[in-house]
From Swiss-Prot:
Residues 151-169 have a biased composition (Basic and acidic residues). The lineage of its organism: Bacteria, Pseudomonadati, Thermodesulfobacteriota, Desulfobacteria, Desulfobacterales. GO terms for molecular function: rRNA binding; structural constituent of ribosome. GO terms for cellular component: cytosolic large ribosomal subunit. Gene3D superfamilies: Ribosomal protein L6, alpha-beta domain. Belongs to the universal ribosomal protein uL6 family. This is Large ribosomal subunit protein uL6. This protein binds to the 23S rRNA, and is important in its secondary structure. It is located near the subunit interface in the base of the L7/L12 stalk, and near the tRNA binding site of the peptidyltransferase center. The keyword rRNA-binding applies.
Length: 176
C-alpha cells in the first residue's frame, strides 16, 4: 500500500539531519530547513538514511507516512542541490526586470507590477525568462504560481506568463 512511505531517504555526506521534539532540521552550507512532524508518524535516522515509520496500519496514517517521506526528501534535496523554476513572459511589450528582491513586470497593464520576492527565493532574468531558485520547494512553487497568476497565458495568441516546460493548448479564432 504505502510504497513511497517505505522507501528510505538517502542523505548526502554534506547534509546534517537532526530530529528532536517531533521537529526535523536539515542543514548544509546552502541553508537550513525545519518542519514539525504531526500525526502518528515518526522518523528514524540511521547513519546516511532516514526512515519514515507509521505508528499504525490505518489508511490515514499510511497516507501521512508517504506525505512526510516526500516532504523530508524535498528538504534533503533542497539543501544539497536546490530547486529552480523558470517562467517565460510572452507578449508584445511584455518585459521583466529585477531590482534587488523586487521583480518588476510590465505585462500589459497600465502600470508596472512590483512583485516582492519572499526571503529564501532568488531570481535571475535573461531576456524574457525569469528563473527562480530556492532550497524550499514549497515556497518556490508558491512564488512561481503567484507570479504566473498575475497574467496567465491565454489560448488564442499565447500571451502571458507560463512555465517554460508548460504546453498551452491553442485555440483557433473565430471564422467569418
Amino acid at each position: 500500500m504505502a510504497r513511497i512511505g517505505k522507501k528510505p531517504i538517502q542523505v548526502p555526506d554534506k547534509v546534517k539531519v537532526s530530529y528532536t521534539d517531533r521537529c526535523i532540521t536539515v542543514s548544509s552550507d546552502k541553508g537550513v530547513l525545519s518542519r514539525t512532524v504531526q500525526g502518528d508518524v515518526d522518523l528514524e535516522i540511521k547513519e546516511d538514511h532516514i526512515h519514515v515509520v507509521a505508528g499504525s496500519e490505518n489508511r490515514k496514517v499510511l497516507a501521512l507516512q508517504g506525505l512526510y517521506r516526500s516532504l523530508v526528501n524535498n528538504m534533503v534535496q533542497g539543501v544539497s542541490t536546490g530547486f529552480s523554476r523558470s517562467l517565460e513572459i510572452n507578449g508584445i511589450g511584455y518585459r521583466v526586470e529585477l531590482n534587488g528582491q523586487t521583480v518588476v513586470l510590465n505585462i500589459g497593464y497600465s502600470h508596472p507590477i512590483n512583485f516582492e520576492l519572499p526571503d529564501g527565493v532568488t531570481a535571475k532574468v535573461e531576456k524574457n525568462v525569469l528563473t527562480l531558485a530556492s532550497i524550499d520547494k514549497e515556497l518556490l512553487g508558491q512564488t512561481a504560481a503567484s507570479i504566473r497568476k498575475l497574467r496567465p497565458p491565454e489560448p488564442y495568441k499565447g500571451r502571458g506568463i507560463k512555465y517554460t516546460d508548460e504546453h498551452i493548448q491553442r485555440k483557433a479564432g473565430k471564422t467569418k
